[in-house]
From Swiss-Prot:
Sequence ranges assigned to domain CHCH in this UniProt record: 42-84
InterPro entries tied to this protein: CHCH (IPR010625), Cys_alpha_HP_mot_SF (IPR009069), Ribosomal_mS37_met (IPR033620)
Swiss-Prot/TrEMBL keywords: Disulfide bond, Mitochondrion, Nucleus, Ribonucleoprotein, Ribosomal protein
Organism whose genome encodes this protein: Homo sapiens
GO molecular function, one term: RNA binding
Protein name: Small ribosomal subunit protein mS37
Top-level taxon: Eukaryota
């Protein structure tokens, strides 16, 4: 285990409650947060799409010969769309456990921090 440097030991020796690190900006919360990027969702229904395209290739791109595969792909796409819709509803209702950035910015604008220490 490394021992602290002489400079750090001397800084703590004079006043043990004084922090050793000196920030270059005051430690005050900002009045807004940055917009986070939405996570990219994973691709859905890849297997159904590949089965449908393989069927099209075998049957010279005739839809009537591949009705079962096309219907399977459309059903999977509809289920994925419903899942995305339910996830977005849960996020807007705040069931995810954290506030969205735009709601947090509105709260921070209503109760701004002082730009100075009092």
């Amino acid at each position: 285990m490394a021992t602290p440097s002489l400079r750090g030991r001397l800084a703590r020796f004079g006043n043990p409650r004084k922090p050793v690190l000196k920030p270059n900006k005051p430690l005050i919360l900002a009045n807004r947060v940055g917009e986070r990027r939405r996570e990219k969702g994973e691709a859905t229904c890849i297997t159904e799409m590949s089965v449908m395209m393989a069927c099209w290739k075998q049957n010279e791109f005739r839809d009537d010969a591949c009705r079962k595969e096309i219907q399977g792909f459309l059903d999977c796409a509809a289920r994925a769309q419903e899942a995305r819709k339910m996830r977005s509803i849960q996020e807007t209702l705040g069931e995810s456990g954290s506030l969205l950035p735009n709601k947090l910015n509105k709260l921070l604008q209503r109760f701004p921090n002082k730009p100075y220490l009092s």
